[in-house]
């Protein structure tokens, strides 16, 4: 089996389950040594065992990304054990999913203000902490890739206010860090997965009391064709092995765009749903949905249209 990342060292935060787990599995399958973090050693060990069965090496490390001392200790361990080498950092840890699911039909003033910290202490501040300590290993080597897992929630309202603000900040974090890292040969990108069939979302969709929930109604039409968590992993492997990755640094990279760029399909062979196709865009407008079946898949909404539509000026 080809191992394009053999010898490379990676860190994936929040890899006990969901997207982080999927990324860790694919990085190990590509032959890398992968440090995975989470707050519970038992689930980390389960992920590590499965990942190592695919190839590579997986090292579970208990680390709360909201605690700088624990983040610092994580990267000191990588530095010590890998002689200063770090090739890929994936900022994925996120502690806000349950808070989002519990408040889907409420406005920001109707929920405790502490939801801001529930969502963004790990999902934004934690990413910055990891970026700081990860960059300190990458910059001296003159190479490396940092990926932050974000979403279109940074463009327009999705779920709630703290979520959208946090995701917009993640995209800006990638852009500004990329600006400062470029001269050192280190890339930083923002990855936008599509709708993903994570364990927690599957549980939410399976509950008997959710059919009338507005979030359930929003996700139901696309959930059966949603991406597997490992699709994000395939995207990260493709980026990490791209010799021209610096050309993409600072950019927002939707998984459907990366699937087209690198010829990727999901782990079960399914094509990745293209949320930027013209057909999909029209399907979201009730009076125009019928046009979808007549449009070829290669017709896409230009990025400048997306930018203009979401412009704040």
Curated annotation (Swiss-Prot):
Domain notes: May be attached to the ER membrane by its C-terminus segment.
Binding site for NAD(+): 19, 64, 163, 167, 198
Function: NADPH-dependent oxidoreductase which catalyzes the reduction of some steroids (estrone, androstene-3,17-dione and cortisone) as well as prostaglandin E1, isatin and xenobiotics in vitro. May have a role in steroid and/or xenobiotic metabolism.
Name of protein: Dehydrogenase/reductase SDR family member 1
Catalytic activity as recorded in UniProt: 17alpha-estradiol + NADP(+) = estrone + NADPH + H(+); testosterone + NADP(+) = androst-4-ene-3,17-dione + NADPH + H(+); prostaglandin E1 + NADPH + H(+) = prostaglandin F1 + NADP(+); isatin + NADPH + H(+) = 3-hydroxyindolin-2-one + NADP(+)
Taxonomic path: Eukaryota, Metazoa, Chordata, Craniata, Vertebrata
Name of the gene encoding the protein in the UniProt record: Dhrs1
Residues at the active site: 163
Modified-residue entries (Omega-N-methylarginine), positions: 21
List of residues binding substrate: 151
E.C. code: 1.1.1.-
Source organism (scientific name): Mus musculus
Any one Gene Ontology molecular-function term assigned to this protein's record: testosterone 17-beta-dehydrogenase (NADP+) activity
Domain of life of the source: Eukaryota
Coiled coil, from the record: none
Similarity comment: Belongs to the short-chain dehydrogenases/reductases (SDR) family.
One of the Pfam families matching this protein, by short name: adh_short
PANTHER family: DEHYDROGENASE/REDUCTASE SDR FAMILY MEMBER 1 (PTHR44147), DEHYDROGENASE_REDUCTASE SDR FAMILY MEMBER 1 (PTHR44147:SF2)
Family annotation (CDD domains): DHRS1-like_SDR_c
